[in-house]
Amino acid sequence: MGQKVNPIGLRLGINRNWESRWFPVKSAIPENISEDYKIRKFLKAKLYYAGINQILIERTAKKLRVTIVAARPGVIIGKKGSEIENLKNEVVALLKKDVTINIKEERRPGSSAQLAAENVAMQLEKRVAFRRAMKKVIQSAQKAGAKGIKISVAGRLGGAEMARTEWYLEGRVPLHTLRAKIDYGFAEAHTTYGNIGVKVWIFKGEVLQKGIQAEKTDEAPKKSRRSRRGR
């Protein structure tokens, strides 16, 4: 089960919080869901190169607040805050209601699964070899303190005639352990040979009563594993 489902959705309410936080009356639920989708789709497309990790949406009776967690907040804010004001006006025009936008910096972009997936996808679009792109992201995640990382790429890798899936695994990624804090990200690389899907799982530690704790290090370090599946 843990291998198939989205690890973030599986852990909601356990060690992950919702990214849309509001409690409306029943009749307003479809409209709010539609607005949340429009906001995320618009911001992801417009601010793709800002390295967006999360878009948090909070609603009260009369207010709508959007918090953007990005690796490069300066790209969003612009000189003297000019870009953020233009962005707010565009979102207001999209929804026809007042919106407050906050920007937060992602202090550890190397440990973000979504940013890692987008990094691999951008390298594939620049014709970088997929194995080289995957290994580079794995090294960045390990330097950022990740306990384990798994990257999977699927499609016509290297321009091959037949699509296949390849994945790398470093460390541990316990998908069945609900107390494990696992980040997940997905991105698509649009290449001349077709789309290549990129999935990334990053294991950050186990969430206990006192928060995330590092694992015991008295065991011998495990060797890296790589496997290929599929034709």
UniProtKB/Swiss-Prot annotation:
Can the keyword RNA-binding be found in this entry's annotation? yes
Please provide one cellular component term from the Gene Ontology annotations of this protein. cytosolic small ribosomal subunit
Q: GO molecular function: any one? A: structural constituent of ribosome
* SUPFAM superfamilies in alphabetical order: Prokaryotic type KH domain (KH-domain type II), Ribosomal protein S3 C-terminal domain
Q: Does the keyword Metal-binding apply?
A: no
Stretches assigned to the KH type-2 domain: 39-107
**GO process annotations (BP):** translation
Which of UniProt's keywords are assigned here?
A: Ribonucleoprotein, Ribosomal protein, RNA-binding, rRNA-binding
Pfam families in the record: KH_2 (PF07650), Ribosomal_S3_C (PF00189)
> What CDD domains is this protein classified in?
KH-II_30S_S3 (cd02412)
Tell me which Gene3D superfamilies the record gives: 3.30.300.20, Ribosomal protein S3, C-terminal domain (3.30.1140.32)
Which family, according to UniProt? Belongs to the universal ribosomal protein uS3 family.
Task: State the function annotated in the UniProt record.
Answer: Binds the lower part of the 30S subunit head. Binds mRNA in the 70S ribosome, positioning it for translation.
Q: How does it assemble?
A: Part of the 30S ribosomal subunit. Forms a tight complex with proteins S10 and S14.
Protein name according to UniProt: Small ribosomal subunit protein uS3
What's the source species for this entry? Campylobacter hominis (strain ATCC BAA-381 / DSM 21671 / CCUG 45161 / LMG 19568 / NCTC 13146 / CH001A)
Identify the taxonomic lineage of the organism of origin: Bacteria, Pseudomonadati, Campylobacterota, Epsilonproteobacteria, Campylobacterales
Q: Which gene encodes it?
A: rpsC
